[in-house]
Amino acid sequence: MEVKAIHRGARISAQKTRLVADQIRGLPVDKALNVLTFSPKKAAGIVKKVVLSAIANAEHNEGADIDELKIKSIYVDKAASLKRFTARAKGRGNRIEKQSCHITVTVGN
């Protein structure tokens, strides 16, 4: 049994989120939540919500036991960027891309 949860368009770059995702890949969900709770990174809070959603999906839809669940797969894909401009000298402007990502978490036995 595998249950999935997806967060689309998270307003953080995929590169920063992958650092957190790599730390919890393959861990039991209780240890993964512990790691995410004490991580100082912004991405940890976002990933924690997705993991909790996947656990809730497994409980509600499949009747799974939380103690047996572990993180089967977690991956982070790049999403659309918001294009913005910032003012520069002599009336010029530079483009800034505000990155976003899609976070997918799969939990199972």
Swiss-Prot record:
One of its GO terms (biological process) is translation. One of its GO terms (cellular component) is cytosolic large ribosomal subunit. The keyword Ribonucleoprotein applies. One of its GO terms (molecular function) is rRNA binding. InterPro entries: Ribosomal_uL22 (IPR001063), Ribosomal_uL22_bac/chlpt-type (IPR005727), Ribosomal_uL22_bac/org-type (IPR047867), Ribosomal_uL22_CS (IPR018260), Ribosomal_uL22_sf (IPR036394). Keywords: Ribonucleoprotein, Ribosomal protein, RNA-binding, rRNA-binding. SUPFAM superfamilies: Ribosomal protein L22. Gene3D superfamilies: Ribosomal protein L22/L17. PROSITE patterns: RIBOSOMAL_L22. This protein binds specifically to 23S rRNA; its binding is stimulated by other ribosomal proteins, e.g. L4, L17, and L20. It is important during the early stages of 50S assembly. It makes multiple contacts with different domains of the 23S rRNA in the assembled 50S subunit and ribosome. The globular domain of the protein is located near the polypeptide exit tunnel on the outside of the subunit, while an extended beta-hairpin is found that lines the wall of the exit tunnel in the center of the 70S ribosome. Part of the 50S ribosomal subunit. This is Large ribosomal subunit protein uL22. It comes from Burkholderia multivorans (strain ATCC 17616 / 249). The lineage of its organism: Bacteria, Pseudomonadati, Pseudomonadota, Betaproteobacteria, Burkholderiales.
